[in-house]
Amino acid sequence: ADNVMSARLALVVLPTVAFVGRLFPNLTVQGLGDPNYAYSLLKQYKGEWEFDTNWKMIFGHPKKAGWIKAIQEAQQTVQKGLKLDCPILVMSSNKSFPETETWHEEYMTSDIVLDVQDIQKYGEKLGDKVTRDTIPNGIHDLILSQKPYRNDAYQTIFEWLKKQ
């Protein structure tokens, strides 16, 4: 029920924020987010990686109305179809999980940033030479997934490249 309400709310809020972004692109519309994605990556918490948290901040970055506008416009363009004339590999995790304030182990094996069904659905509309694949237990940044799933992502990429 929460996911359905969030989706309905997004249908109203995102276009409104995008419109505001035309007039006030630098207006902050969302402050810092939850740290769970960073926790799933960083070695000092639950992950395998070390990185500069000044560049990839633990709580994300403040979202500006102009940024939301640009993303919404880009997503609408992709959803209509791009007709790119080149081989394209669309990859995602095999599952999404909603990020909340509370830590869940599913964050380690799910995309908690984007809806993987949308990635696969709209990825097909990028062009006529699209190959789609899912990586079981991959995270949003597939190459930063836990080692076994990261290896699956690399194998998928290299096998696809050999066929090109």
What is each PLM-predicted segment?
Residues 59-81:
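Active-site nucleophile elbow and catalytic-triad environment of alpha/beta-hydrolase enzymes
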Residues 84, 90-92, 107:
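Short beta-strand/loop motif that positions the catalytic acidic residue
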Residues 1-63:
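Alpha/beta-hydrolase-fold enzymes
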Residues 120, 126-164:
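Catalytic active-site module of serine/aspartate enzymes centered on a nucleophile-bearing elbow/loop
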Residues 3-6, 95-99:
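Short glycine-rich His-centered loop
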Residues 12, 76-83, 89:
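Alpha/beta-hydrolase superfamily serine-hydrolase fold, recognizing
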Residues 34, 70, 164:
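A hydrolase-biased, glycine/serine/histidine/acidic-enriched motif that marks catalytic-domain neighborhoods
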Residues 97-134:
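Conserved loop-alpha-helix segment in the C-terminal half of the alpha/beta-hydrolase fold
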